[in-house]
Amino acid sequence: KGKKNIMRRIRIFVAYDGTNYCGWQIQPNGITIEEKLNKALNRLTREDIRVIGASRTDSGVHALGNVAVFDTESPIPPERFSYALNQRLPEDIVVVKSDEVPLDWHPRYQENISKTYEYHIYNAAVPNPLKTRYCTFVSFPMDVEAMRAGAKYLVGEHDFVSFCNIRTNTQDTVRTVYDLIIEKKDDEIVLRVTGNGFLYNMVRIIAGVLIRVGRGFYAPEKVKEILDAKVHTSEGATAPPNGL
C-alpha cells in the first residue's frame, strides 16, 4: 500500500516589489501576491493550497520579509520550498527562506511577535527616476527634528482609530508602537515603525501626518491632537503606497 504523507505547515519569508500588484490579498479584479504564491504552490505540489500572510499589504506596497504559512502533504524538504517556488514565481516575488513550523502556528496570532514597516521619502529639488518605485518624492525642505518630536507622541499603547482608514474592519483599534525612528541620509528620509500590529493604512497615515509636520503645515503637537481626537480623520492624507 502507498504510504500517506503527513500534513505539515511550512513558513515562508517573502520579498516583493509591489508596484505591479493589487496588494497581497486575492482580489476579483487584479493580480495579487497571494494569488501568485497560491498558483506556484499548486503547480509545485499538485495540491489546492492557500497561503495565509502576516501582513495583507496594500496595492503598490513592497516587502522585504512578509511571513506566510501553508499546509501541505508534499514530501519536499521544508528548506527546499524556497528554491522550488522561486523557479515558478515572477522575478518581482522571491521566497527568501522556508522552514517548518507547528500546525497551530499562525503568522498573525503569535505572542511576542512584532512587525516593522519602513516608509521612504526622497527629499530633493527634483525626482530621481531610480528612486520613484520605492520612495515618495517631496520637493520641499523637511524639518526632520520636528518630525521626530511629533513621532514621540505615537510611541506606546494607544487607540489609533484616528490613524486608520474608515474601511478598517475591526472594532479593536488599540495597538502598541514599540519604536518610531526617523533617519535622514543624504536625500532620503526613512520612517521605521515597529509595533505589535497595525490597522488598515495606519503606517501610511502616520507617514502622511509626519510629512505634514516636516513641511511645517503642522506643529509636532498636532500629532497628539489627532491621536487624542479618536475619530477617523482625513487630516493625515494617507501617504502614497510606493514609499512603504
Go through the PLM ranges and name each one:
Residues 2-244:
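Structured-RNA-binding interfaces characteristic of tRNA pseudouridine synthases
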